[in-house]
Structures are given as C-alpha cells and as structure tokens.
C-alpha cells in the first residue's frame, strides 16, 4: 500500500504499478487517510513530508505537515488490533545535528540534537521523530537520512546552494541505496535487536566529501571549472548549515546490507 497525494505527477508515476500495489490517494495531515493506508500493514515506512528547498520557503507549513504526519502515523498504528506486531520506520534527517564543520565533522546518532538557526525543517523532523519514539509504538526505528544523490540533482537550481559552507562535509547516500535499505528492512531475517534504535544512513567512505569537493564534481559534469573560478567565495555561508561524516553508518549497513 502507498499513500500518495492525488497530484498529476503522482498519478503518472504510480500508474505503471496500478495492478501491483494498492494506492490510497490522500494526505498525510488527514488522519482518516493515514488510517486507511496503515490498515492491514505489517510494516509502516513513514518517508513522506516536506523537505528543502520547499521547506525553506514555507516554514510554518513544513512544521505543520511533518509533525502532524508523524502524529497521524503513530495514532493510526496504535489504533490497529495488532499494533504491537507492526514495525514502524521513521526517516529523520542529518539536519537534526546542525553545523558540523571541522574539527567536529565526525558524528554519531548519540550526538546531541542541535538545530541550526532558522532551520524550521530540522525542527519539524526532530519533533516528528519524537512523536514516533514516544508514542508507545512497540517496534520502531529511526533512520536519519543524509543528502541523497540522484540523477536529477543537476536540475535543482536554487539559492540553497549558497547556504552550504564550502568547508563543510557530508556523507552522501545514493537514491538506489536509500530505496534498497527500505526494502531490506521489511525482510523477515532482520535481527530483533535492530528495532527501537537510531541509525545514520550513508553510502560509505567513498561518498564522504567536503562540500568543495562535491561542488567541483558537480560543476565538472556540466563542463564548468571549480567554484572559485565562477562564483565569488563570499557568496557562500561559513556556518549554520548541517552535514557530517558518519562514524557509525557502517552499523546500518551491517544490519541491512543495502550498499551497492
């Protein structure tokens, strides 16, 4: 079962799978829609919500949508007759641990939650994570997603690119790895001690880059020189963003074996 908004884009994307899955056309902020989506589920993967850069333009809407959605998911799961048997996965964000420029650029899930100034998206993800963890759901897991690498990333021309400090770092996750880990999470052979814990999602050592290195690689794909050759370095912020290299991303890989 997939819960999706009845937009033209979603209907086009899901049309090829119409005979293979059950689609609930609805809204995560409407409890009855979420309840219908959860009905009969053994696993609930709460992946949807508002993300940047849209989240930066609509901060109040972002907080409402992301928090309300998590509350509805928790309420719907607990309303099921087999609630204690349902396994729930919530997708958090690297943004929850804020600015991590060197020398504090290595991080773990146990690090303090620390949100960048004006980052309403990170606030919403933290409150939503709390709503799931403290709801009373018996079997939950929180996976904090990093930046996702996907082919259309080159089409995202937005001022947010200057909100990223060049000396910052990030351990990226590919879209393929991200999808595979959700599929593997639903397998019956997942160890019992996997649940009721927090994990960081990352595609591993080869995907640990400084933001400057990433900008260079990105620009090279469109035959452009290094950032300092075409941008004024002063256009980029120096801090108050997020991103880190994970000291513990291998833990999730050891459980779910999702990396290519």
Task: Explain the meaning of each model-derived region.
Residues 18-68:
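NAD(P)H-binding glycine-rich loop region in Rossmannoid oxidoreductase-like domains
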Residues 50, 71-118:
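Conserved Rossmann-fold NAD(P)-dependent oxidoreductase catalytic core, especially the SDR/UDP-sugar
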Residues 48, 89-93, 144-146, 202:
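Active-site beta-alpha turn of Rossmann-fold NAD(P)-dependent dehydrogenases/reductases
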Residues 1-9:
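Conserved glycine-rich Rossmann-like NAD(P)H-binding loop of the short-chain dehydrogenase/reductase
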Residues 64, 96-141, 165:
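Catalytic helix-loop patch of NAD(P)-dependent Rossmann-fold dehydrogenases
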Residues 181, 185-255:
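Mid/C-terminal beta-alpha module of Rossmann-like enzyme folds, strongest
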Residues 9, 29, 61-72, 115, ...:
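Glycine-rich NAD(P)-binding loop of the Rossmann-fold in SDR/ketoreductase-type enzymes
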Residues 123, 164-189:
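Substrate-positioning beta->alpha
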């Amino acid at each position: 079962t997939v819960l999706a908004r009845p937009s033209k884009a979603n209907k086009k994307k899901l049309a090829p799978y119409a005979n293979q899955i059950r689609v609930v056309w609805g809204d995560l902020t409407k409890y009855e829609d979420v309840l219908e989506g959860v009905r009969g589920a053994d696993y609930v993967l709460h992946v949807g919500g508002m993300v940047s850069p849209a989240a930066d333009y609509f901060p109040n809407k972002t907080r409402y949508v992301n928090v309300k959605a998590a509350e509805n998911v928790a309420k719907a799961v607990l309303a099921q007759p087999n609630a204690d048997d349902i396994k729930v996965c919530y997708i958090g964000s690297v943004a929850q641990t804020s600015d991590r420029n060197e020398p504090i650029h290595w991080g773990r899930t146990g690090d303090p939650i620390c949100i960048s100034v004006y980052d309403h998206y990170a606030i919403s993800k933290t409150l939503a994570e709390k709503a799931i963890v403290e709801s009373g759901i018996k079997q939950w897991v929180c996976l904090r997603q990093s930046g996702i690498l996907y082919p259309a990333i080159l089409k995202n021309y937005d001022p947010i690119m200057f909100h990223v400090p060049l000396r910052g770092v990030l351990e990226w996750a590919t879209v393929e790895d991200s999808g595979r880990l959700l599929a593997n999470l639903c397998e019956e052979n997942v160890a019992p001690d996997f649940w009721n814990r927090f994990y960081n999602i990352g595609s591993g050592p080869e995907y640990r880059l400084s933001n400057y290195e990433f900008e260079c690689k990105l620009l090279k794909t469109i035959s452009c020189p290094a950032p300092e050759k075409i941008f004024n370095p002063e256009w980029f912020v120096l801090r108050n963003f997020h991103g880190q290299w994970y000291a513990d991303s291998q833990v999730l890989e050891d459980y779910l074996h999702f990396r290519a």
